[in-house]
Amino acid sequence: MLSRASIRAYSSIPNSVKIAAKESATDLTKLSVIINNAGSKTGKSGVSHLLSKFTFLNNGAKSALRFTRESELLGGTFESKVTRDALILNTTFLKQDLPYYVEALGNVVSNTQFAPHEFNEIVLPTANAETKLANANPAFKGVEKLHEITFRRGLGNPLFYNESTPIKLEEVAQFSKEQFSGENISIVAEGANEEDLTKFVSESAFCYLPSSSSNGAKALPTNTFTGQEARVPSSGASSALIGIPVKPADFGKYEVLSAAIGTSTLPSTSTPLAQIPGATSHLYKYQDAGLFVISVSGEASQVAQGIKQAKSVAESVSSSALSEAVKAAELSVALQSTVDSPLNVKVVAEEAPISKFNYVAVGDLDVLPYADEL
């Protein structure tokens, strides 16, 4: 199912930058620049995260302070985020300010200065703080470890920068130069006229980007592994997670299974996992593969019992329960589909095996079970 918020067709300018837009009845425009092959799965571990912290800093056209103040006066918002597939720049603003933000985003991707003082005083501290905050959550640490043991490299790379893998400023700048090419960039907007958007993009710094880069880093082939286990000692709350690698063609099956047992996207008190404290499921979807995760978080003894119960729940879902969950799965997919990450997943009520899985325990390892004890 394709969300109503998603956009089907792209036009392009001569350097292969892809453009798509749909109009809306509101006065707001959501404009996103998606740089594919610039996510955490590509290049050195952490370099994409550091690059995301350089966006909206000083560039050849204007300073970060000037852009921030101008955006505040216009009432707009902006952010950058890194996913495993891409680096994404998001802006939201009033419709009449579309030319300003197209110009600003064009300068971000084509003209960032990569100043040494910004790297040391802003980029590294901000990235380290985000990494520390994320790793304070045992469920996040568990999901990261599940990706690592399931995919190893590529999609198994950590989402965020870690000081254990040193990265120089020159490496971030080079990664930007290699990945910020027209063939990798899609510009999508909700609440904008596509003809106007294409005109503004063609008049902006986006047109200075090369069509392609022969030296660009390529994502590694996606290999998956099962039967793996990892145990991570951690203070505070505990988390136990089961992960099943999923082919893109099977996304629909696992979305239905997730809806049937209880999904984090569409919480419901009537699902089986809702009866287990701290339990939920989610299908992480990427361009080349996915990872279906069943997790339980909370106090260690509750997690130890809960993960066993959650696994049993997933193994015992009936065909009738899957059929009844189709509509909920369609709604869940629609809720996950956004302007910057549109989904095209056809849900189907078919068996979604979980027999071949990976397992991660985070927290009090004296209490949390091993995989063969589930």
UniProtKB/Swiss-Prot annotation:
Major subcellular site: mitochondrion
Membrane topology designation: Peripheral membrane protein
Xref: Pfam families: Peptidase_M16, Peptidase_M16_C
Subcellular location: Mitochondrion inner membrane
Any Gene Ontology biological process: mitochondrial electron transport, ubiquinol to cytochrome c
Phenotype reported upon loss of the gene: Leads to decreased vegetative growth on several carbon sources including maltose, citrate and acetate.
Key word Electron transport present: yes
Family, similarity comment: Belongs to the peptidase M16 family. UQCRC2/QCR2 subfamily.
Transit peptide, residue positions per record: 1-11
UniProt miscellaneous comment: Has antigenic properties. Elicits a specific immune response in systemic candidiasis human patients undergoing malignant hematological disorders.
Protein name: Cytochrome b-c1 complex subunit 2, mitochondrial
Gene Ontology MF annotations: metal ion binding; ubiquinol-cytochrome-c reductase activity
Keywords for the protein's UniProt record, in alphabetical order: Electron transport, Membrane, Mitochondrion, Mitochondrion inner membrane, Respiratory chain, Transit peptide, Transport
Function of the protein: Component of the ubiquinol-cytochrome c oxidoreductase, a multisubunit transmembrane complex that is part of the mitochondrial electron transport chain which drives oxidative phosphorylation. The complex plays an important role in the uptake of multiple carbon sources present in different host niches.
Organism: Candida albicans (strain SC5314 / ATCC MYA-2876) (Yeast)
Assembly: Component of the ubiquinol-cytochrome c oxidoreductase (cytochrome b-c1 complex, complex III, CIII), a multisubunit enzyme composed of 10 subunits. The complex is composed of 3 respiratory subunits cytochrome b (COB), cytochrome c1 (CYT1) and Rieske protein (RIP1), 2 core protein subunits COR1 and QCR2, and 5 low-molecular weight protein subunits QCR6, QCR7, QCR8, QCR9 and QCR10.
GO cellular component, one term: respiratory chain complex III
Induction: Expression is induced by interaction with host macrophages. Expression is repressed by nitric oxide. Expression is also decreased in stationary phase. Expression is repressed by HAP43.
Domain of life of the organism encoding this protein: Eukaryota
